[in-house]
Amino acid sequence: AKQLKEKRFKKGAISFETQEVKFKLDENFKPKELFIKIRKDAHKLIEEFMLLANRKVAEYGNSLGKAEKRKTFVYRIHEEPNEDKLRLFNLFAARFGYKIEFQSQKAIAHSFNALLDSLEGKPEQNLVQSQAIRTMSKAYYGTKKSMHYGLAFEHYTHFTSPIRRYPDLMVHRLLFNYLNQGISANEAHYEEMCKQSSAMEVKAADAERASVRYKQVEYISGFIGEEFEGIVSGVTEWGIYVEISQYKAEGMVRLTNMQDDYYDYDETSQSIIGRKSRKRIQLGDGIKVLVTAADIFKRTIDLALVDDGVKREFKKGWEQEKKRREKKSGRKRRR
């Protein structure tokens, strides 16, 4: 497995090992613990042999029929990244001291891997990794054979998971047909199914992200009034987004709630600047924040920058809110 992986990377494969958020739930399905999944050697071994199986099946599919008219088959396609997107990512990465080389596709892959390796264990790891993945082209399914850029494979398909992915089931059906000397399947019909599968994959990924976000907010709602270390993950004219480093959950500090100064947004430097203090807060800065609110249904987390004034005012308001809630619940019990 290690030899297979080494061979892939020599050919220009890119390693995108994201930090996957997981939860432990109680008997009422409420999150009682949030943790980052650790990929072990056993996971990587299985992954490499699944990649090998998928590649070999794709190679077999591409060998069916005559060179000028191959039999219909389903491939997993990943195109080269858009150069404009790469340049924008380079500007983003430069804020953290990283750089991507553009001389060739192998140079891009090599510098991407070097960047991702150097991020390991750093506060900005999740932020930069996520942005790097968004820079890449979206993989999709199709009947026209094309390379898989991210894996550096000339032929690739999805074959190993027919119980959870419809394209794998399509591949199994095509294999069964061709192994029994069947004629080529209708290409237009399979191309349409590939487009539908690609569209549904995007929807499924969106739903998964939303569900993780929901549980993150639900979990963070138990930490109202507590302080956390974070990293500035976005800057806008209405506020700054901060990723809570411990839980990989993003919240917002609104400019209207920043009481120490009046801040102006500088789009060029992706920062906000205090008019009186000239204090600058920019993308990638490490800061300490206080959780002030969490709305599960809107999936939003409200934060405030930590200073003594903010803490005093928040704690005073929070104590009043707790007393109001206790008084309200007492009235309900008496009824």
Go through each PLM region and give its residues.
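Electropositive polyanion-binding surfaces
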Residues: 1-259, 284, 290, 295, ...
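Short nucleic-acid-contacting surface segments enriched for D/E, G, S/T with interspersed K/R
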Residues: 223-226, 262-289
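C-terminal edge strands of extracellular/lumenal beta-sandwich accessory domains
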Residues: 310-314
